[in-house]
Amino acid sequence: MNELRKKPLFNPEGDTDVRLRRMINGNTTNLNDFNNMRYPWVSDWYRQAMNNFWIPEEINMSSDIKDYPELPEAERTAYDKILSFLIFLDSIQTANLPHIGEYITANEVNLCLSIQTFQECVHSQSSVSYTHLRA
């Protein structure tokens, strides 16, 4: 069984032939060349991720702020616990995805991980915005 290897920051001896590119344990240069991708699904994933992008300031929460105090205690408790769990998940994902990327040797796939990391940070921000409902 092969051992997982972290990719180098730059490898001048890495493979430039896209046919030799591997998702894990490849001989990557670690240079981005998104015109030559081994994994073409990345383009569709990238477009979808960018189309789904939003920021918390775009969401009007004024009715949520009014509705929260009117929820029954059990629903407020459920809401608070779910929100805290989602903040936890976003935090773990934001911290963990770069560590996974250290082992991905197909740069186009690392693009996906970078975008997901960024969007998890935004999710964390939006979750924190929702904690103001409880104030």
Model-derived segments and spans:
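Alpha-helical bundle segments that constitute or directly flank the non-heme di-iron/ferroxidase center
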Residues: P72-Y103, V122
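Conserved small/polar residues in nucleotide/adenosyl-binding loops
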Residues: T131-A135
